[in-house]
């Protein structure tokens, strides 16, 4: 079996080399992204990058809400590896606030080709037609 392509994840306990698993949530087919690492030669779940909030609005199939556990580190990870664009919208559930992100499906396909392809097929799109990150307007680029 081929070793998955990893990304560095920095957090308060150090640096982890993680790989992505792309899938969809069973209840509504929203985008799921999991963070995994190899433990004793086997893939082991490290954390969920996304959380399913079926009541919260999304702007497209490439959008998801970020799990609130270590969310600052997760948002930094997304920016660092250019996996998506952080949106201004948030959603609340219980006492938690979740940030919305528009993911670049082509970029996700670089790290989990099979999972991304299956997710896209489930939604009837091909990789060449994948939604990209929303382009930044001029004032955002100058920051």
State what each model feature region is.
Residues 133-143:
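Non-Sec secretion/translocation targeting segments of pathogen effectors
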Residues 2-3, 86, 143:
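Structured catalytic/translocation cores of nucleotide/phosphate-coupled proteins
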Residues 34-82:
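Acidic, aromatic-enriched beta-alpha/helix-loop junctions
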Residues 49, 99, 141:
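A broad, low-specificity signal marking well-ordered, structured residues that form hydrophobic/aromatic
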Residues 1-40:
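OB-fold ssDNA-binding interfaces and closely related basic DNA-contact patches used
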Residues 67-121:
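Short, compact, well-ordered microdomains
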Residues 1, 25-27, 43, 76-78, ...:
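A generic structural signal for short, solvent-exposed coil/turn residues
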Residues 116-133:
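Short, cationic low-complexity segments
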């Amino acid at each position: 079996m081929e070793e998955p392509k990893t990304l560095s994840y920095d957090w308060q306990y150090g640096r982890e080399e993680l790989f992505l698993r792309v899938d969809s949530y069973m209840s509504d087919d929203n985008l799921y992204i999991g963070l995994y690492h190899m433990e004793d030669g086997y893939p082991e779940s490290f954390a969920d990058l996304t959380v399913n909030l079926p009541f919260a609005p999304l702007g497209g199939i490439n959008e998801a809400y970020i799990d609130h556990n270590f969310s600052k580190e997760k948002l930094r990870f997304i920016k660092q590896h250019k996996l998506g664009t952080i949106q201004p919208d948030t959603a609340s559930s219980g006492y938690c606030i979740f940030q919305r992100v528009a993911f670049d499906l082509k970029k996700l396909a670089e790290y989990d080709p099979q999972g991304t392809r299956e997710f896209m097929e489930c939604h009837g799109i091909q990789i060449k037609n994948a939604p990209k990150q929303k382009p930044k307007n001029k004032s955002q680029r100058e920051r």
